[in-house]
Amino acid sequence: MSFAPEPSFSHGKPPAASCATAILLCNLGTPDAPTAPALRRYLAEFLSDPRVVEIPRPIWWLILHGIILRLRPKKSATKYASIWTPEGSPLKVWTQKQALMLRGYLGARGHTVEVRYAMRYGNPSIASQLNQLKADGATRILILPAYPQYSGTTTASVFDAVYSWAARVRRIPEFRFVNNYHDDPGYISALAERVRTHWRHYGQAGQLVMSFHGVPERTLKLGDPYHCECHKTARLLAEKLGLGKDRYKVTFQSRFGKAKWLEPYTEPTLIRMAQAGIERVDVVCPGFTGDCLETLEEIAMEARHAFLKAGGKEFHYIECLNDSPTWIAALAEFSARQLAGWPTQAPRDTEALRKSGERALAMGAPR
């Protein structure tokens, strides 16, 4: 097995990066454009991940390439086109802004840390960003998934991508991995502020629906903690908002395929609520830290249409955390705790570096 070539190294010189400690904020991914060809590439990568679809590979390959990649890209492209912005995909836009703001907030706290973002599927890839961080001199990297709740289908897949990259590298940086932050007080407070802000502007509905991304039910039975962590997030958020159990519902969206997923499903729940005479509903998606296709199109458009068609009168979608200062401050505080013990504040000792370089050259180092 051959390993990737190492970046050039000179004794006694600091790395190109401002600090050897870095954070890689990892999100799910997005196509490069709202077109069928771009969606075909994206879906092929996404749906080929065994963490996402746990079906024997030969059988799934036939289904994926024989049916799904022939039919789904065009339909998905239309959905993406409905939410695409001049800046590009909302998910990518928000993730990029969060990374930039996180670096700034950490800097304001005295932490000199490089922060980049990457996508598990699509661009910029996790491997490409790790390559760049390594080339810039990062020797300690915190892997920070944009998923508050752990799932083997998302968080573990990010870790897989990091492990895969490391398997091809000779000199591996030191890594730390964040599993979850579903019950982090700062995250819960940021969610509560988002909801309260919406209520101040538009009033408060009698029911708050908390919609999380769904996963196959069998993953729960096989030991995935995602379902439990979603419910804990919902409970803590409800408590922060002062809502009793009869004032909120937890639902799961984005079901794919015919297998049973975590229930209750979001859209059927909203339809039943409208049919039961509930005229207004507020919907928030706590598991998504940035607005994306699943929130802007599936909830704010499709679910809204279903609720109103079933007899509802008012549907309010509460936007994700996005670039909320309260959220970024909470993320910075959480990240700082995860970085504890790593040097992020000490100034670089240039004199020590110079002497180290002189010793290395005296012992025969080429540079």
Curated annotation (Swiss-Prot):
Stored InterPro entries: Ferrochelatase, Ferrochelatase_AS, Ferrochelatase_C, Ferrochelatase_N
In this chain, Fe cation is annotated as bound at 213, 294
> Does the record's keyword annotation contain tRNA processing?
no
Q: Which reaction does it catalyse?
A: heme b + 2 H(+) = protoporphyrin IX + Fe(2+)
Primary subcellular site in the record, as a coarse category: cytoplasm
Give the enzyme's EC designation.
4.98.1.1
Its cellular-component GO annotations read: cytoplasm
Give GO terms for biological process: heme biosynthetic process
Q: Which UniProt keywords apply?
A: Cytoplasm, Heme biosynthesis, Iron, Lyase, Metal-binding, Porphyrin biosynthesis
List, alphabetically, the Gene3D superfamilies matched. Answer: 3.40.50.1400
Cite the annotated pathway: Porphyrin-containing compound metabolism; protoheme biosynthesis; protoheme from protoporphyrin-IX: step 1/1
Q: What is its subcellular localisation?
A: Cytoplasm
Enumerate the NCBIfam families for this protein. Answer: hemH
Family listed: Belongs to the ferrochelatase family.
The identity of this protein, by name, is: Ferrochelatase
What species is given as this protein's source? Polaromonas sp. (strain JS666 / ATCC BAA-500)
Gene name of the record: hemH
